[in-house]
Amino acid sequence: MLFASFDFLLFFLPVLAAWWALRQRPWARTAVVLAASYFFYMASSRPVDGSLPTPWYFAGLLAFSTVLDYVCSARIDKLAARAEAGADPRDAARKRNLWLTASVVGNLSLLGYFKYTNFFLEAFTDVANGLGASWVAPHLELMLPIGISFYTFQSLSYTIDVWRGKLTPEPSFLKFAFFVVFFPQLVAGPIVRASEFLPQMHVRPRLRLEDVNEGLFRIFKGLVKKVVLGDWLAVAFTDIVFDTPGSYTSWENMLALYGFTLQIYADFSGYSDIAIGVARLLGFKIPENFDRPYQARNLGEFWRRWHMTLSTWLRDYLFFPLGGSKGSAARPYFNLWLTMFLVGM
């Protein structure tokens, strides 16, 4: 289900109406949008041509990640409380680390299995054949769950923040599940931090004219980027050139490359604008994701302006824990290389 589709409009209007109609009943309101988010996720996961049904386990993986991080963070917090109450701090720290490890391994194992299993099987086949063996690895029929990187990073950062003592775990499983699967940003971001989102769930929502105006403006802005600019560039120019590049001059191919950079920006930032606008109509503020990246003066500034919620996530949960810019003269470059390598993977 694409944002820029009539199907999404038919989905969103009843959800919006139910959300505000149930504003005096927080539990029911949250449960309705939580169920709607799962429906949206499954509908968005269906192949565009409809040739295959959406695997049922897509929703199961999302639920598993939610339950895993809810349980792990609760146990981490309870162990920290026991240590403060006089329990053996070393034993508590060891057990807290084990629960954090369970969250990290559980989440990243699923992400790695679906994204890289066939990649490594094919690589092993190529290496074996290069060494003279006739072994051929099986190709697994795996469909990559849509948005798995985004919701994995989002739920994992919650557990890490609890482990660091920066966040008190959410006692309500319903609200935590809502945070993980909130449909406007579930499929392609922005990646939301629990410290920014969960406090908004503990405030009774108010339908304000400011939110309506901003929400509608961001949706309109995103649709113009996505449909008028991004889709038009693809249909009218870039796809045509890339289909038969040998039929065009070097200048036309170069223009197509520049056109494609504009196309992917319009697609991605347009989607983020719509997500921000839809969330705003529901009374939630989620972070900006793009800040005019093509006006950056260098690559470092471009990185900070493009998909900002991902770049800050990688900085806070990968680059800094590796040591950041500290250490020997070569260490910062290794940390940066490893971060970029993992991003590319």
Regions found by a protein language model. Give the residues of each.
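Membrane-embedded transmembrane alpha-helical bundles that form the catalytic cores
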Residues: 1-345
